[in-house]
Amino acid sequence: TMEDKKLPEKVILMYDAVIGMLEDGIDLNQMKVIDITKRAGIGKGTAYEYVSSKEELIVGALLYDIQKQFERIIGVITATDGFQSKVERILDWILDNFRECKTFALFARIGMGTYDISEHLQNEMRKAHTKECCVTNTLEQVVDEILECGVKEGILKPVKKELQRMAFGSQILI
């Protein structure tokens, strides 16, 4: 988990500031380091002790927030038995936490190319994507657990995991 990495408190403050700005409707492309650090209650120069660019900070914040959400949903899924119950719990969780799912939806839109971002931000997203992305692994883990449950119960056919993931994801995100 991301908490295992023990992020410095000031990094968490900056990440929370970015997420708060997103929740307030501020576009990623309009965010400035000075506004992020002011909201986080730290000096602008402090940001550059931890990150090399605004884009690295924004992408880090998105990944951090998504990882937190996934850790919560994994808790919900693993505490639930049965395919139908797991799917219902996910849908309930999404409805109950819709505001908090904003980052995930934004991240998905960026990944699918339906949200315009600056070239610098695109480059940072690519860098984050090429690293072993724990967010993707966590999402696959959650989806695979649900799908395996569906196969065991005879609700789903045992087909390629990639196809199952795509079909499941498209139905949940629609």
Task: Set out the residue ranges of the language-model regions.
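Hydrophobic alpha-helical segments that form the core
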Residues: 96, 140-149, 157-174
